[in-house]
Amino acid sequence: MCMPLSCRRARATVSVAALCAGFFALSFVALSPTTVRAQDSAPGADPAPSPTTEGSTNGGTADADGAGSNDLAAVVVTGTRRTTRTIFDSSAPIDVVKNDELASVPSGNMNDKLQQTVPSFNVQRLPLFDGAIFNRPATLRGLSPDQTLVLINGKRRHRSAYIDVTAQGAQAVDLSEIPLAAIERVEVLRDGASAQYGSDAIAGVINIILKDGEGSSGYIQGGQYYEGDGANFLGGVNAGWALGERGSLNLSAELSSGLSTSRSNQRPNAAALLAEGNAFIRQPVVQRFGQPETRAAVLFVNATYELGDSVELYAFGSGGYHWGENDFNYRNPTQGSVFTSTQPPEVFGPNFATLPPAYQDWYNNNPAALSGYPGGFTPRFSATSWDASAVAGVRGDLTSDLLWDLSARYGTNHIEYHIRETLNASFGPESPTKFDTGTKQQTDLGANLDLNYSLGAGLAEPINVAFGGEARREIYELGTGDRSSYEIGPAGVIGLAGGSNGFFGTGPNQAGSWGRNSVAGYVDIDADITRRFSVGVAGRAENYSDAGSTINGKLSSRLGVLEQLNLRGAISTGFRAPTPGQANLTNTNQNPAPDGLSIQTNGTIPPTNPISALKGGVQLEPEKSFNVSLGFVAQPLAQLTLSADVYRIDIDDRIGLSQRYTLTPEEQAALLASGVPAAQGLTSFNFFVNGYNTRTQGLDVVLAYDIPLGAASHLNATAALNLNETELRSASAGVIDARQRQYIEDRLPKRATTVSLEYVHGSASVLLRAREYGSWTEPLDPTTDEAGRLIFNQRFGPEIFFDLSAGFDVTEHWRLTVGAENLFDNYPDEARFPNTADAAAAGAIPSNGRVYPSQRPYEADGGRYYARVTFDY
């Protein structure tokens, strides 16, 4: 609960739609309070005048170039290919989040850092959702995780191998693979940009700029939650050297580890066994609901070298290892289909007689104890991720007006899944207790040629004409697990489940490798018609070997109404091509039928499978978007900046899972006769379809004020707000049910607010940050829809969290910071878990040991304290 304040039940009464209805509606764009120079202006460049300020960065250390913490004259490289475009003169909203501000968030996960510094960015914490425990779905403007393009130094980053079935099958970049030590700043373009960058840039673009300077810096941080668990460590170092007079080499490394947390009660079935005298039940809880145990090590390199006066070689890359482990659902020692048969006696008896004698003895003499689990078991699920990337290129200028850049890139993510302290019940006394359940791998390769021409046309500035092409190849692979992780053993005939219990292994019928190629060409024109009026036009054509062709365009403009006030707006079309993984995913499991005489196969199959085609499955097409934004940026006072933008994003043909189908005997016979053996025994299935259309609209605003308080002191104040709402406009029959609709429209807060105050005096500083999230819904509490069908949801109210930190320079090069995240130990509402509508009416109580919601858009582990030591030479 929000103990010191009575604010958590506040409700917003003005809808996002109403705010977005008029021409003058405002939307808050998060211009970070620590915006800094993105790059030096090109030699000889003369950008249009922009407001500038003076100030200090977080931590009280002045910027090297004297730029202030809310510097609208900072040059940005995202959303434009003009080398002198500033934040103030940009035609689209851009956030620039500096390394110091990211460091003020104690979490070592980049997703958490961006969530607390960019209000329109959200990441969920999912303690019980298979791979999503470790690959957490992150969203920009409430859209799908893979509808945001991620770049490193302006080059496309490869995807994770994980396909997140909790987020409509999204396959996105894993931002947790990118360490703070390597980052100079993060630029977040919150506008459609597919016409400039290609697939995925529907919600926007996150461009991570790596450090490239000389010297060394680093940090060591330790912390723990107020509850006494979740101890965590984070350490990173960055070092840069000159390579003679022509180049530079910069290396970054980071190590992190974290112990698990538990915010749980004892499960009722375990408590009942304890009361009956079972001394083997784990206490205080058999199952932990909380954060996983984690370990990670990441290395980044960034280098440049001048080959001549007009040619430069550059390269950057990374390698990473991430491991995590968490509890799955508890299985009690009398669990049906695990230790006891669910078959009726007339079926069980004849089947039992066919078992080998060792299996019969095992079943008749306490199978739980003989398997090593007299108190039942809680499977421990883990994932090991190996990540690698490399980008290399050459760039230069053919003339003073023509720049060129030729590059190639490679990226891969390999995930291994394991489960232990479990069994394959169908193998009875011969079952292993730990399993390798399979692998997933995503590999991306690409090559780019980009040219930039400065065309003199007698305008305020030369017209910037950028054009180029891109070729890409993507490969998705599924590898098999241990045979015992997916096979059904002899005891399957008596109704005991096959496969590794808790997480079914990948079998040969699911494994495979799928690839696709794509080529693209683009033109991007940026013209300053006058000093105060600019226009941008971009177009891109792209062809995919498996998803057809698409052409997209963008028109943007900026109008300087006053010297300190710019209006801006953009209209664009966009797209996201389905990934090879989504187009070819096979995720099935096998278990005995209730009669024990046959095997049931259920799961997800590719939409192009002949079985899917029988039910309307076709090759997936790209999702298509239409994006409109309008806003302003202003600096009414020397130290005060304000920006606001309203947006609307319509997305058609969004990809989702179909309803579940079954085959009639006649359909099975026809498929078998046409050479489709997989139809044999397929009980039920679904597949991905381009099935629904949505509209997302909202408002982004930021206010930043750097207030001088004397010669050595100042107060940095910022307030940022995001209002965001998604509605389902239409859906194909059988694709979206009531529960899925709730997930699309209401799984995330429609409001996120961040307010921070940083007082700086000399080398000492104190930072207070407040984070508020609006209400949201999780599918847990049984209700019925208009048709009387049972659906599950529970509404959770707004929450506010306070963070406090203080730091000072111990020496010229060393700094100490101590702080508390979630200072007042606030927790969300407790979740209700009734199993029936009658239970809900009678008053729900926590059950199954879970106390807090399992799909929360913020942590539910309470407050934590930490200390951090940093150095900079």
Map each language-model feature to its residues:
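N-terminal periplasmic accessory domains that precede
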Residues: 110-113, 117, 138-139, 174-176, ...
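Extracytoplasmic beta-strand/coil segments of soluble accessory domains associated
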Residues: 115-159
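Transmembrane beta-barrel wall of Gram-negative outer-membrane proteins
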Residues: 227-375, 379-393, 397, 804-805, ...
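C-terminal beta-signal and adjacent terminal beta-strands/loops
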Residues: 651, 772-783, 808-873
